[in-house]
């Protein structure tokens, strides 16, 4: 069997049977078309509760009679008595009897559409054009078809059904064919009806029509199943579509290439790329076994190439393209466009250039080809190449579409290429290409960021005065000014919204955000309070924005008030606004208030997340309050929230402050376990562990962390300083000296404590020359020596034979006259150590 779908038999029966359906045939209880026109509103049929949509058959793109009634709209109607086309007055889905002979004005629209349809009908030849005209102009099917009764061929009946735009009319004609008794309705006719009803999402009728086929012994063919799979998958019922595929497999029928293409499209649309690939491979193998000369069409290859591309399988896409060429299938423009898009999206621009050369040998690039190329090169920051392709497109006689202009214009705008952008705008204006709101706001942002405020305002006014801007357009322009701190301009745009009565919650939210960026918290609050007076109700985003603004401005008390209002309106669905207020209280050192907000949050059944716990644990870690910090750790565990690196770092910081080595080690191990090859504990945390180990002279453990940090290039000044102190404390002067030398060579000595550690080591180990040189480096780098520095230097002088009294006298001079005292220290040290005096250079 081709496809072994493991479907439960009972579910298959439910999806593909009519036992639960109230009707046995789509026609058994179907009202006449005349009745439908009077009473029926499409999409509201009482027996169809599934998704509704109005569709047109793709083979017939227009019509002169509107059989659908849409509430509140005027539709085209034909007066059966005189064939005149006019408007219908529609009230609440029903035809207004007062507008019987209403007609269109002379704008040429109706005649143009009718001409296109007439041309299509005439192409059929024979009696078909007259039949279709009759069906459009005469309401009763019997009257419309009576001149041709009992002499319509199978082909003519097929065309008549296929040409129907509305499913109701198609059903009525289909029923008329059956009622005549002289017409044999074959599987092709049923296939057409299944497609028409499926496109209209009339699933109960589809199922009933299927049952009717089986009952009458009309055997489904490959295209029948393909049609069913197609309409169900496009109607959003993928499980039902798979059910029909399963039924097909169950009777041993192998999908043909068309049906296979439908299945592949279904999987691709659902982004189930692996299933699409598996199905294609199984089908291809079976096809090749059955007929070794089977050659797939370009459509099937294009579908698979696109499927591989969307799933990121470049190699497979390339191999499929290669196989297509080997089998002699001429690639289409769609094929090349797809391959260019795949290679370009994966950064293989060399392959893109090669494909373009090959493409020009087989088929002409279209506008979409150039749009893809322009987009790819703008994304890769090759704006010059993108512009060249835009020019090439026009040189080839292709007219850029709105996508072409929009892509290039956006690329110019984000790069502040004002002159190029303005040139493109002029071209768009000359060609009457509409500039969409997304592009308009991008250009406003370009002018703002280029500090061309006058131009930005005139650009905005152009679209504002035209009166076509939506709320989203106004809000985007407010945001363009607000993000750059141009508050007065943002306010002017906001006022313009009021002029055209387009103020919605979106504009208020963006304006409040702009006030927040400019630190105008009072204005943000005033605007919030004024919303209701303009009939605009704040939404969740409004409250969230205002609370975040106040919290970040160190105004947690006010933020808490709005948080309470937010909770009362039912907009608090998570802990994010509470976390903002808690963090603000913590920042101000008001931990009692932070805990109060936390308790309030828990009381209202709003669950804290790891960020909330992290803020509180870190706050109490900073104060060294182990008990409070651990209480939140326990609360987090009880809530089933796993710790993360932020929590672990805070705990290690806490344990370091209070000297809890075992607890710190346990947490550090967890931190290491949660890390990977590219992520390690942060520098501060590792330094904390080295500090704990060095205080306890646990040299090997400290060295292990130190070596690991050096390998990653993360060891900083304090890492080296702690290792130096540990070695010095344990009398390991050789290792300590090596550390000191490394610190000097790496030029990472920037802190008085680090310098003092190095000076203390050199003084203790008798390395007086290095000590003096280090002291000179310290002074020349502008780092102020302190009492600890001179204590080490005094030790050196006394070891070199100077009396304690003389050393004390030098120090007294330094305290009275800093500059003279430093010069005296340096000259004395240099003289006794035997190195050149560099006082003049200092």
Swiss-Prot record:
Keywords, in A-Z order: Repeat
Amino acid composition bias (Basic and acidic residues), ranges on this chain: 45-59
- Does the UniProt entry include the keyword Repeat? yes
- Spans of the PPR repeats? 186-220, 221-255, 256-290, 297-331, 332-362, 366-400, 401-435, 436-470, 474-500, 504-538, 539-573, 574-608, 609-643, 644-674, 682-712, 716-750, 751-785, 786-820
Listed GO CC annotations:
chloroplast
> Which stretches of sequence are listed as region Disordered?
40-61
UniProt GO BP? chloroplast disassembly; regulation of DNA-templated transcription; singlet oxygen-mediated programmed cell death
Q: Which InterPro entries does the UniProt record give?
A: Mito_RNA_Proc_CCM1 (IPR051114), Pentatricopeptide_rpt (IPR002885), TPR-like_helical_dom_sf (IPR011990)
Q: Return the SUPFAM superfamilies for the record.
A: HCP-like, TPR-like
Q: Which NCBIfam families match?
A: PPR
Question: Which family is it part of?
Answer: Belongs to the PPR family. P subfamily.
- Protein name as catalogued: Pentatricopeptide repeat-containing protein At3g23020
